[in-house]
């Protein structure tokens, strides 16, 4: 354990109902209810619903698919998220659609129009929920030749104009991909280019931004903790956000990014090693306003596909000085 390090707790999570890149959960209503009970018990009170509509090569997936629930209480999985969030006192940020075909064809104006129509429809549909307090720009991590900054800017402008009562949120990644889809920006390049071409443009439109932290390796040599560069990211991005009046949060990813010597190929996203999570939390805590994660339901919950997720949750609670016995009380 680290001495004199005060960790901020994870106080929110994404909810990914369509893409199974971090594992297939096959949760039923009781499983979801237990997850919400657990989150409430440990201080997670924000839900960021990601990718509610997806399209690729003409194939579409929807969080409003009536086959997504096998219980009568909810017509679809998206209805359930809103209902349980209301019941357990959560704050919901709703993310929009994403069409890979639009992006690959360079039809970014259609992507903007699809987002506008989606938010018009869903804000009206779910506006009666008191928990519904924010909108989330889902498209956030594609390279320059897909015009993703133009899309995000126009969607944020539409949100602010048409839904001024809603807070706005994004979660792009540190070290975003360059146009070659391989190399990444270093921190100074990221702050300069993302600053000039995006964040300065959306000053006053974007309330909160939680960059995906990406750095996983808990670098250490003979017991001495080494600098892995993540602190520099928080410091320099924090300065940029302060100039743009954007509150700096962080998305501490709870899936394992491959790092040298770990023996896993890229694209394998199981739950994180608890030492990596400890490193991420200790570095971010003094420098950000809020910590959220991608994501509790498929990586930290005992309901996940991954066998050690229950133990990851137990180690996380120990980091915060909490008794992991609550896991057995809720999940048996």
Label for each model-derived stretch:
Residues 1-49, 61, 129-132, 324-332:
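Mature N-terminal, pre-catalytic/accessory segment of carbohydrate-active enzymes
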Residues 7-14, 45-48, 89-93, 131-136, ...:
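Structural preference for beta-strand elements that scaffold enzyme active sites
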Residues 29-100, 147-170, 222-241:
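Aromatic-lined substrate-binding rim segments of carbohydrate-active enzymes
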Residues 35, 46-48, 206-221, 236, ...:
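Substrate-binding cleft of secreted/luminal carbohydrate-active enzymes
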Residues 55-74, 100-111, 260-267, 306-308:
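Surface-exposed, active-site-proximal loop segments in enzymatic domains
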Residues 72-88, 107-134, 151, 155-158, ...:
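An active-site-proximal structural segment forming one wall of the substrate-binding cleft
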Residues 97-102, 118-148, 209-212:
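Active-site groove signature of glycoside hydrolases
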Residues 130-143, 170-174, 190-227, 296-299:
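Aromatic- and acid-rich polysaccharide-binding/catalytic face
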